[in-house]
């Protein structure tokens, strides 16, 4: 092995300082290290070892199934490098093309998803504390342009952080040239990934075509971009903290049910700057497992700040945003399901053979059929002798009518629901319960049909309950 040079010492010292200042590593920590065999990851593996931090390293190689002619040699090489530094080694195969075709993703996106999923599973399997990858300053510049072309805002253009949860990136301050020189001085070999030269990948086109062209206008472009990302990162931190403060002042999260409900106070929210308002709405949606588009965020902001009321917006996965006087409520009235046009249609046809408690996951509700008067809000009582099992719980049909108890005659179910201030897709929350003879017994949770009412001569009653699922 060659004599340690001054440049080698500079590189290792730089990484050591980054770890000390920005990363939470401690002696004895077990770390998953992503090692592809390329210069960056091989340098990372050796630098971590030579820093003598007493880390337990597990080198993980991901076979994406895209370069079958090169993979065996790479696996053998990485295994040898891991053994040379005393690290454990595992090769994991993933099927990128299957995910790409199934979810209509680009090859790059599918590979990234599967790669990080494999790292996360390996971390659990080995009981490791963190995952470490070899992203460097050149990757940071390329990522800036990838995100810029995709329309990212300040947060995205701030670049990749040194730490993102359990993911650590200790090489972000080093360039590709730094790492290649490190390997050269240490006499360490590395693999060349042939796919890095293929123009079909966006990152490659940026690295091989766009950046060289832009550097004709600004030879210091890469340093300029890194400086810009650093400025944006600092400003992003300030904005994020300010948005959190507005979020804490203006929202209340109710976790009593199976799915969370968030209430946004319009007055407190309206006092915030528009930039912070957008972030608060995005934060609410993410916390409720929804991915809002720019249009969603803008519409919700208008709903909260303008003087409109009783308006409802639909987001994907069943999330509903409703204006209620002085607040906006985010909730899942039908459960976490697709409700928008073009997504999976909700269907409901449930046979009820007798008494019991019946989960209706389609609506995040449960139906209870029991003998006696029962107890609980929203229970309806009907004459047992008039009930013919099996019953059927389903959505009402267009034009379907029944005779509500207390009404002078028959009425369309849809019109009855409208009269009860139940509108739009909220009507699905109140399906009809059909008797064995085909007649409507009740709109569950709201009303029974007059012909099934209890009378003085009723010998036994059936109680019909309809509650939101809370367990």
From Swiss-Prot:
InterPro entries in alphabetical order: Lysidine-tRNA-synth_C (IPR012796), Rossmann-like_a/b/a_fold (IPR014729), TilS/TtcA_N (IPR011063), tRNA_Ile_lys_synt (IPR012094), tRNA_Ile_lys_synt_N (IPR012795), tRNA_Ile_lys_synt_subst-bd (IPR015262)
**One GO-annotated biological process of the protein:** tRNA modification
Q: Where in the cell is it found?
A: Cytoplasm
Pfam families xref list? ATP_bind_3, TilS, TilS_C
Listed GO MF terms: ATP binding; tRNA(Ile)-lysidine synthase activity
Protein EC: 6.3.4.19
Q: Which reactions are catalysed by this chain?
A: cytidine(34) in tRNA(Ile2) + L-lysine + ATP = lysidine(34) in tRNA(Ile2) + AMP + diphosphate + H(+)
Keyword list (alphabetical) reads: ATP-binding, Cytoplasm, Ligase, Nucleotide-binding, tRNA processing
State where it is primarily located: cytoplasm
Supply one GO CC term from the record. cytoplasm
> Which residues are recorded as binding ATP?
36-41
Q: What is the disulfide pattern of this chain?
A: none
- Entry comment, domain topic: The N-terminal region contains the highly conserved SGGXDS motif, predicted to be a P-loop motif involved in ATP binding.
Q: What family name appears in the similarity comment?
A: Belongs to the tRNA(Ile)-lysidine synthase family.
- Function noted in UniProt: Ligates lysine onto the cytidine present at position 34 of the AUA codon-specific tRNA(Ile) that contains the anticodon CAU, in an ATP-dependent manner. Cytidine is converted to lysidine, thus changing the amino acid specificity of the tRNA from methionine to isoleucine.
Protein's name according to its UniProt entry: tRNA(Ile)-lysidine synthase
Organism, by scientific name, is Desulfotalea psychrophila (strain LSv54 / DSM 12343)
Q: What is the lineage of its organism?
A: Bacteria, Pseudomonadati, Thermodesulfobacteriota, Desulfobulbia, Desulfobulbales
Query: What gene is it encoded by?
Result: tilS
């Amino acid at each position: 092995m060659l004599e340690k040079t001054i440049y080698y010492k500079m590189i290792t010292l730089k990484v050591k300082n980054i770890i000390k200042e920005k990363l939470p590593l401690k002696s004895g920590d077990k770390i998953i290290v992503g090692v592809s065999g390329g210069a960056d990851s091989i340098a990372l593996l050796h630098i971590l070892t030579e820093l003598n931090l007493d880390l337990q390293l597990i080198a993980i190689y991901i076979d994406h199934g895209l370069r079958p002619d090169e993979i065996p040699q790479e696996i053998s090489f990485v295994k040898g490098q891991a053994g040379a530094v005393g690290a454990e080694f595992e090769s994991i195969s993933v099927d990128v093309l299957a995910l790409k075709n199934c979810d209509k993703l680009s090859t790059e996106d599918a590979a990234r998803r599967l790669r990080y999923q494999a790292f996360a599973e390996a971390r659990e399997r080995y009981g490791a504390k963190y995952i470490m990858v070899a992203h460097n300053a050149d990757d940071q510049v390329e990522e800036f342009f990838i995100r810029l072309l995709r329309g990212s805002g300040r947060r995205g253009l701030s670049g990749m952080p040194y730490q993102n949860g359990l993911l650590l990136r200790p090489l972000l301050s080093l360039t590709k040239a730094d790492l290649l020189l490190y390997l050269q001085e240490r006499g360490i070999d590395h693999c060349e990934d042939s796919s890095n030269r293929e123009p079909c990948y966006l990152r490659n086109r940026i690295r091989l075509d766009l950046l060289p062209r832009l550097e004709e206008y600004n030879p210091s472009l890469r340093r300029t971009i890194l400086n810009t990302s650093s400025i944006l990162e600092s400003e992003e931190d300030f904005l994020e903290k300010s948005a959190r403060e507005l979020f804490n002042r203006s929202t209340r999260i109710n976790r009593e049910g199976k799915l969370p409900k968030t209430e946004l106070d319009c007055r407190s929210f309206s006092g915030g700057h528009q930039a912070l308002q957008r972030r608060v709405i995005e934060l609410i949606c993410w916390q409720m497992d929804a991915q809002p588009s720019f249009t969603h965020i803008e519409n919700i902001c208008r709903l909260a700040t303008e003087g409109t009321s009783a308006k409802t917006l639909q987001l994907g996965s069943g999330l509903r945003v409703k204006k209620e006087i002085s607040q906006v409520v985010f909730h899942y009235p039908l459960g976490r399901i697709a409700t928008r046009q073009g997504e999976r249609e909700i269907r409901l046809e449930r046979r009820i053979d007798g008494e019991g408690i019946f989960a209706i996951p389609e609506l995040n509700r449960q139906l209870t059929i029991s003998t006696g008067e029962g107890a609980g809000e929203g229970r309806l009582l009907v004459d047992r002798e008039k009930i013919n099992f099996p019953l059927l719980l389903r959505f009402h049909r267009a034009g379907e009518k029944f005779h509500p108890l207390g009404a002078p005659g028959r009425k369309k179910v849809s019109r009855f629901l409208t009269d009860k201030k139940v509108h739009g897709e909220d009507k699905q929350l109140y399906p009809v319960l059909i008797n064995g003879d085909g007649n409507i017994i009740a709109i569950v949770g709201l009303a029974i049909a007059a012909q099934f009412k209890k009378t003085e001569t009723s010998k036994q009653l059936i109680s019909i309950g309809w509650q939101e699922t809370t367990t």
